[in-house]
Amino acid sequence: MEEPEMQLKGKKVTDKFTESVYVLANEPSVALYRLQEHVRRSLPELAQHKADMQRWEEQSQGAIYTVEYACSAVKNLVDSSVYFRSVEGLLKQAISIRDHMNASAQGHSPEEPPPPSSA
């Protein structure tokens, strides 16, 4: 009869021991220690990723600014085509006046071709 009683007492002791080990293993301070270890191992990599992302963001912002500036410049060129046409007309008019003045200075009318030079 003592053996079943001894087994019961042994089972109670092992159950209490198991419960104590479980409580100790899951105690908040142990959990916080494990969390601290995880953070200590992971933090440098996360900090590097953050720095990389910030650098990429700066590069992207610079590229976006460059593209927007280029688009603005192209739009301004398109908008200024009226002025280019006006300048072109004025240049043609100036060339025509110059030719007329050169022809008048040589005694020829602009419609007559100049005499061939004997060179």
UniProtKB/Swiss-Prot annotation:
A GO BP entry: organelle transport along microtubule
Pfam families hit by this protein: BORCS8 (PF10167)
Entry-annotated residues carrying Phosphoserine: 109
Domain of life: Eukaryota
Primary location class: membrane
UniProtKB keywords: Disease variant, Intellectual disability, Lysosome, Membrane, Neurodegeneration, Phosphoprotein
Keyword match Membrane: yes
Any one of the GO CC terms: cytoplasmic side of lysosomal membrane
Compartments where found: Lysosome membrane
Family label: Belongs to the BORCS8 family.
Function: As part of the BLOC-one-related complex (BORC), it plays a role in the movement and localization of lysosomes at the cell periphery. Associated with the cytosolic face of lysosomes, BORC recruits ARL8B to the lysosomal membrane and couples lysosomes to microtubule plus-end-directed kinesin motors, driving lysosome movement toward the cell periphery.
Subunit structure: Component of the BLOC-one-related complex (BORC) which is composed of BLOC1S1, BLOC1S2, BORCS5, BORCS6, BORCS7, BORCS8, KXD1 and SNAPIN.
Pathology linked to this chain's protein: Neurodegeneration, infantile-onset, with optic atrophy and brain abnormalities: An autosomal recessive, severe early-infantile disorder characterized by global developmental delay, severe to profound intellectual disability, hypotonia, limb spasticity, muscle wasting, dysmorphic facies, optic atrophy, leuko-axonopathy with hypomyelination, and neurodegenerative features with prevalent supratentorial involvement.
Protein name: BLOC-1-related complex subunit 8
Gene it is expressed from: BORCS8
